[in-house]
């Protein structure tokens, strides 16, 4: 079992999701070693990289939400999944539209987007809950 941590921003984003959808979302959110080594078995996982930075992406079963997360080591050396942002698909489509990007090749386009990395930076800088 993985420990999952949230920052203030991602915690607020999750709290805006109805309770039953939260349960369903996090029930299906299972991070395995394949996800962390860049060889995810589950196609719902992906990796967004830029300038040596890596963030992982999980698409919910209904393709309704995206969870963007990093993996850090805790004091015991175990992996901790740190949820940086939780975005509804509609907000992501809006982001693509406003950024002038299409929806195809989502991870590759996000990797090139300064606005996306700013969104992630804001999450990383937020205090953890």
Where are the regions a protein language model picked out?
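Arg/Lys-rich, positively charged N-terminal/basic patches that mediate binding to nucleic acids
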Residues: 1-32, 103-129
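Short non-domain terminal segments
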Residues: 4, 24-25, 43, 56, ...
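A short, surface-exposed loop/turn module that caps and links secondary-structure elements
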Residues: 31-59
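Enriched for short, Lys/Arg-rich terminal
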Residues: 58-129
């Amino acid at each position: 079992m993985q420990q999952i941590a949230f920052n203030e921003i991602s915690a607020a984003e999750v709290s805006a999701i109805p309770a039953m959808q939260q349960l369903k979302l996090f029930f299906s959110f299972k991070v395995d070693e394949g996800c962390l080594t860049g060889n995810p078995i589950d196609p719902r996982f992906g990796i967004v990289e830029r300038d040596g930075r890596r963030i992982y992406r999980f698409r919910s079963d209904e393709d309704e939400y995206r969870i963007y997360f990093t993996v850090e080591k805790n004091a015991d050396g175990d992996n901790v999944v740190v949820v940086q942002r939780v975005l509804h698909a509609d907000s992501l489509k809006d982001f693509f539209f406003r950024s002038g990007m299409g929806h195809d090749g989502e991870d590759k386009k996000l990797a090139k987007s300064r606005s996306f990395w700013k969104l992630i930076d804001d999450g990383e800088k937020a205090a953890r809950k």
